[in-house]
Amino acid sequence: GPPYDFGM
């Protein structure tokens, strides 16, 4: 989820 949506 925001701010990270890179799927890591």
From Swiss-Prot:
The modification Hydroxyproline is found at P3. GO terms for cellular component: extracellular region. It comes from the Eukaryota. Coiled coil: none annotated. Transmembrane segments: none annotated. One of its GO terms (biological process) is neuropeptide signaling pathway. This is Callatostatin-5.
